[in-house]
A protein has these predicted regions:
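N-terminal Rossmann-like or analogous alpha/beta NTP/dinucleotide-binding catalytic cores
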Residues: 59-143
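Glycine-rich, Lys/Arg-enriched anion-binding loops that position phosphate/diphosphate groups
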Residues: 140-238
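N-terminal catalytic cores of NTP/NDP-binding nucleotidyl/phosphoryl-transfer enzymes
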Residues: 9-71
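A short acidic, often aromatic-flanked loop/helix-cap motif at beta-alpha or helix-coil junctions
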Residues: 9-13, 94-97, 154-159
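Phosphate/ribose-recognition catalytic cores of enzymes acting on nucleotide-derived substrates
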Residues: 194-305
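Short beta-strands and strand-loop turn motifs
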Residues: 21-23, 53-54, 87-91, 116-121, ...
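Residue-level signal for inorganic ion chemistry
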Residues: 29, 79, 117, 178, ...
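Short acidic-hydrophobic, aromatic-tinged amphipathic segments that line or gate anion-handling sites
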Residues: 2-10
Length: 305
């Protein structure tokens, strides 16, 4: 898969006709994968290229929600798994004031050489989100033709699968539910210096900060897994303000990696979240905290058996 930054791409970067998958693809959940799959299949059917068109950050929603499920790097990795030929990355501010017709001719027909597209039933484009999937289909039909595949709504139980639903689940600590939606929550960040209090207690931990663009999960303790090089280790992660040992109010991640001993400061580690265990507690002593962590470790080991 080739990655194209639309700010710097050459005018003939995509020289053959293409089928463009349209969406923010934040979290790349099962509904997004349907859109990407349809673009891939239509492109293969017509012997041309498939393109995923997306943004380098999550556009601000009307409710002010901007927390991303995936960073741009995580999004690229997920889209690559779908077999797409190109991912075209744009900046939302550069196109947000284009009319639907301007977006169609400048971006789709012009830059991306699109003869077809794939989108979800609720896809919006044009200034003020003034046009939707049906208007996109009409623009193709009225301007030389081209197929537009519109994916239906996907529901699980009473819930519509969407990035908004997934962000809500993350903030409620329901990270285990994300797997049934075709996505997950993880944090990839550098290991920074902590106060070494846990290490002095015989429970070494790594400290990380959640990237500012990411949605922050419910504060508390989680069963997690750490990727270190080619190896994966079960772990227990606390997301929060460390109420027993600190009161500066700064949210961070502190992870005890089970079965690992090594120097990780300065390295970037991915922590995958699997299950919420409990909220933050203020323990009466460090010994009581130690006992609770040992209990959480046992739960983590049992979870991955």
């Amino acid at each position: 898969m080739r990655i194209i930054n639309l700010k710097t791409m050459a005018s003939d970067e995509i020289s053959c006709p293409s089928v463009v998958a349209l969406g923010t693809f934040d979290g790349c959940h099962m509904a997004h994968k349907e859109v990407l799959k349809n673009a891939f299949l239509l492109a293969r059917k017509n012997g041309t290229a498939s393109v995923a068109y997306t943004f380098d950050s999550v556009p601000k929603a009307k409710n002010g929600d901007t927390g991303a499920i995936y960073t741009i790097e995580e999004k690229i990795k997920a889209i690559k798994k779908m077999g797409i030929d190109y991912i075209a990355i744009d900046t939302f501010d550069d196109v947000k004031n284009l009319s639907p017709e301007e977006f169609f001719f400048k971006v789709l027909r012009g830059t991306l050489n699109a003869f077809g597209a794939s989108c979800g039933y609720n896809y919006k484009f044009g200034k003020g989100a003034s046009a939707g999937a049906n208007e996109l289909k009409e623009l193709f039909l009225e301007n030389g033709g081209g197929s537009v595949v519109i994916s239906d709504k996907i529901t699980l139980g009473e819930n519509t699968v969407s990035s908004t639903l997934i962000r809500d689940l993350i903030r409620e600590g329901e990270v285990e539910a994300l797997f049934s939606l075709g996505t997950n929550y993880s944090v990839y960040a550098p290991v920074v210096e902590g106060k070494h209090l846990a290490t002095k207690m015989g429970l070494p931990t790594i400290n990380q900060y959640i990237p500012k663009e990411k949605a922050v999960p419910k504060l508390g303790v989680y069963i997690t897994e750490c990727e270190i090089g080619e190896d994966v280790y079960p772990s227990v992660t606390n997301v929060g303000v460390r109420p027993t040992t600190d009161n500066n109010g700064e949210v961070n991640m502190e992870t005890h990696i089970i079965g690992y001993r090594g120097y990780l400061y300065g390295s970037s580690i991915r922590v995958n979240f699997y299950k919420y265990l409990r909220g933050e507690k203020k323990f009466s002593s460090k010994e009581e905290l130690f006992e609770e962590i040992e209990k959480n470790k046992e739960e983590a080991v049992k979870y991955f058996k």
